[in-house]
């Protein structure tokens, strides 16, 4: 049986690994997950990512987490906004700010998966996938 929400699974794995200071975490591979990882890397929330094969030959997205020191984390929280049961769409002029601009909303738009700031600059709306701060 397939997974209902691979994005939520990815965010939960990152959140859990981040809380126990893992260096990396393996996530289910999907195109959207790779695009979210690109945005997280670009905004500085993760150290990087790779696409690898597991022992069965399936693609796995390996996300490398980063920490400023041994006690603190860069990602304070990461939350799914739009869910399979309740999709959340916003117009280009109604894009929410996360913690008054300290956090980032990741939005799936017609221009690709981008941050809330980029979506405001391009004046393009879309589905709010998650919030990170």
UniProtKB/Swiss-Prot annotation:
GO terms for cellular component: ribonucleoprotein complex; ribosome. GO terms for molecular function: rRNA binding; structural constituent of ribosome. Keywords: Ribonucleoprotein, Ribosomal protein, RNA-binding, rRNA-binding. Gene3D superfamilies: 3.30.1370.30, 3.30.1490.10. Signal peptide: none annotated. Part of the 30S ribosomal subunit. Contacts proteins S5 and S12. It comes from the Bacteria. It holds the Pfam family Ribosomal_S8. It comes from Syntrophus aciditrophicus (strain SB). Transmembrane segments: none annotated. GO terms for biological process: translation. The lineage of its organism: Bacteria, Pseudomonadati, Thermodesulfobacteriota, Syntrophia, Syntrophales. One of the primary rRNA binding proteins, it binds directly to 16S rRNA central domain where it helps coordinate assembly of the platform of the 30S subunit. Belongs to the universal ribosomal protein uS8 family. This is Small ribosomal subunit protein uS8. NCBIfam families: PRK00136.1.
